[in-house]
From Swiss-Prot:
Zn(2+) binds at residues 13, 16, 35, 38. One of its GO terms (molecular function) is zinc ion binding. The keyword Metal-binding applies. Residues 1-54 form the ClpX-type ZB domain. Belongs to the ClpX chaperone family. Pfam families: AAA_2 (PF07724), ClpB_D2-small (PF10431), zf-C4_ClpX (PF06689). ATP binds at residues 118-125. PANTHER family: ATP-DEPENDENT CLP PROTEASE ATP-BINDING SUBUNIT CLPX-LIKE, MITOCHONDRIAL, ATP-DEPENDENT CLP PROTEASE ATP-BINDING SUBUNIT CLPX-LIKE, MITOCHONDRIAL-RELATED. Keywords: ATP-binding, Chaperone, Metal-binding, Nucleotide-binding, Zinc. ATP-dependent specificity component of the Clp protease. It directs the protease to specific substrates. Can perform chaperone functions in the absence of ClpP. Component of the ClpX-ClpP complex. Forms a hexameric ring that, in the presence of ATP, binds to fourteen ClpP subunits assembled into a disk-like structure with a central cavity, resembling the structure of eukaryotic proteasomes. This is ATP-dependent Clp protease ATP-binding subunit ClpX. GO terms for biological process: cell division; proteolysis involved in protein catabolic process.
Length: 420
């Protein structure tokens, strides 16, 4: 240990300037000295910077209200689902932030989320927008492509590979990402009774997903596909990955209705019919998911269930026009680049919405309807300098007339004849 000569003049810390008799220790280097207090301070600074680097994406965690405000900019309606998601996601990342030395014995467990709603109700968009809000890696998987290990199809580890790829192979980032698994209802057991036949895309897949949902160190093939002996693997801890599971769960209303009917004493079971579809879904319970075909262990790992409502004409019209990246704004901008104004009448917006409801595609089908309507316009207009404005009417959407084309003076330059 370094010792100072007694006749040597009083030494000072080269960083804070304190004399050696003012501190407990003074460590000497090549012409410099540092005291124990400065060493402790430097150590704290390094630890803080390391902590910031490992949780860079969530250092400034938005509040549930801020998360919901951001969701409102891109997702129309579904207020209850957005509130449930905002609280669940906030609590999830708050839990990650507090990981480290425990001051007490309370351990915060992860709560994955299930989104139940019809096709086109906004399940995928909600999950995508959440990931953007929090600046974390995001991956989408389809449960119908998954099978048990040893059968043709994707292993569940391939879901993790997509997240790793979204994080540019930064494992630390991937371990704090979000994975959305769609069509989760399609891996429900075919009946509540176990069967001697193999259900390679049902209960077996639930068991495989269960491992990564609850938190495990998974071995992921870097090139995807099946695992092979002697293959180099990527190791990833799924403990802090948030899983959002989505599904339409067609027919689950009947399951809920049966449960409610059984509990109505002194009334006929038809009494449960007074509930409309949305009111029924609002009363969904874990036992309903089990009756539908999800195993109890799987349900236990997804404690938060948010119900999304079927979108009506008004909601679909709002989706077309109100969000920051609304479809009408996108196509208007597209034609604007060719110096052409695009206008949809109110009746046209209603017709688009009604057609999406007819097709049972919800918001997901809006883009294809607009694309079908505008394909000829987007083909012809760039080579027709006379056109400065295009008006889309309800008749255009219903394929009764062509879009109305106008020149710079406001003159109609096509006759809007009934389409052949």
């Amino acid at each position: 240990m370094f010792k100072f000569n007694e006749d040597e003049e009083n030494l000072k810390c080269s960083f804070c300037g304190k004399d050696q008799d003012q501190v407990k220790k003074l460590v000497a280097g090549s012409g410099v000295y540092i005291c124990n207090e400065c060493i402790e301070l430097c150590s704290e600074i390094v630890e803080e910077e390391l902590a910031q680097n490992t949780s860079e994406a969530i250092t400034e965690l938005p509040t549930p209200k801020e998360i919901m405000d951001h969701l409102n900019e891109y997702v129309i309606g579904q207020e209850k689902a957005k509130k449930s998601l905002a609280v669940a996601v906030y609590n999830h990342y708050k839990r990650i932030q507090q990981l480290g030395p425990k001051e007490d014995d309370v351990e915060l467990q992860k709560s994955n989320i299930a989104l139940i709603g019809p096709t086109g109700s906004g399940k995928t968009l909600l999950a995508q927008t959440l990931a953007k809000t929090l600046n974390v890696p995001f991956a989408i998987a389809d449960a119908t492509s998954l099978t048990e290990a040893g059968y043709v199809g994707d292993d569940v580890e391939n879901i993790l590979l997509r997240l790793i790829q979204a994080a540019d192979f930064d494992i630390d980032k991937a371990e704090k990402g979000i994975i959305y698994v769609d069509e989760i209802d399609k891996i429900a057991r075919k009946s509540e009774n176990t069967s001697i036949t193999r259900d390679v895309s049902g209960e077996g897949v639930q068991q495989a997903l269960l491992k990564i949902l609850e938190g495990t160190t998974a071995s992921v093939p870097p090139q995807g596909g099946r695992k092979h002996p002697n293959q180099e693997m990527i190791q990833i801890d799924t403990t802090n990955i948030l899983f959002i599971l989505g599904g339409a769960f067609d027919g689950i209303e009947d399951v809920i209705k049966r449960r409610l009917g059984e509990k109505v004493i002194g009334f006929s079971s038809n009494e449960a019919d007074k509930y409309d579809e949305q009111a029924l879904l609002a009363q969904i319970r874990p036992e309903d998911l089990q009756a539908y075909g999800l195993i109890p262990e799987f349900i236990g790992r997804v404690p938060i269930v948010a119900n999304l409502e079927t979108l009506d004409v008004t909601a679909l019209k709002n989706i077309l026009t109100q969000p920051k990246n609304a479809l009408v704004k996108q196509y208007t901008k597209m034609l604007e680049l060719d110096d052409v104004d695009l206008e949809f009448t109110e009746e046209a917006l209603s017709a688009i919405s009604e057609k999406a409801i007819e097709r049972k595609t919800g918001a997901r089908g809006l883009r294809s309807i607009i694309e079908e309507t505008l394909i000829d316009i987007m083909f012809d207009v760039p080579s027709n300098e006379n056109v400065t404005k295009v008006v889309i009417t309800a008749q255009t959407i219903n394929e009764e007339t062509e879009p109305e084309l106008y020149d710079a003076e406001g003159n109609l330059i096509n006759n809007s004849k009934t389409s052949a």
